[in-house]
Amino acid sequence: MPRILWSIVAVLALAGCGSAAPAPTPSATPSKVSSAAPPASASPAALAGPVRHILAFGDSLFAGYRLAPGQGYPERLQSALRARGINAEVTDAGVSGNTTADGRLRIRFVLNSLAARPDLALVELGGNDLLRGLSPQDARANLAAILDQLKARHIPVLLMGMKAPPNAGPEYQAQFDAIYPALAKQYHVRLVPFFLRPIYDRPALLQADHIHPTAQGVDALVAATVEDVARALPGAAVSRAGARSSDRL
């Protein structure tokens, strides 16, 4: 099982993993997820309140690597939130291969490119830092810089945590695993302790590369996190049945 976990977190950047950190360019401009009709369980009339804008800022796990249109995490999350009556529009700002340093470079560009200020930002980065064995201290500093940008604009955050595998070594593992809970506490943001927990030891939910989630794997990630997202939205109603045990600060 540790080997499977390492294969997931170590090669999230299958496309473009060897390139240098890209400068923000128009090609990195986030795209709004299609606002197609929500599923039958949530007709448009059932959607409550104004549009809730959510920014999904991350790497290939948000970018929908090798998935058909509409099957990525941002799209499926939007549908799941609408099924709960939340009038959500999720903007996909995932870029395959991004490290925390890449995210730090482009966060301001992404925020300046948005038509509306997000009601919530999902921050999901760090897997590619594991791939390259990059310094946990640098990863933490980069994530802190991203959170600083969001804090300055008064944008609430849900931080998607990652965990290093045991074969990364006990010292590296301890340092890396401490990043996300420490930042969540420092910045008073909500935390999903380990974003990949629903799929990391379930090969049937992974693509042939044994790295990226299949469409069913994405649905498992959404099912495990949709209530965390809903709770992180200021003023959003959340069903009691959906309560989970993940950290909420």
Place the predicted regions along the sequence by residue.
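Sec-dependent bacterial lipoprotein signal peptides
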Residues: M1-A15
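Conserved Rossmann-like nucleotide-binding pocket used by diverse enzymes
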Residues: A13, E89-T91, L158
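Alpha-helical cap/lid subdomain in secreted, periplasmic
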Residues: I86, R104-L249
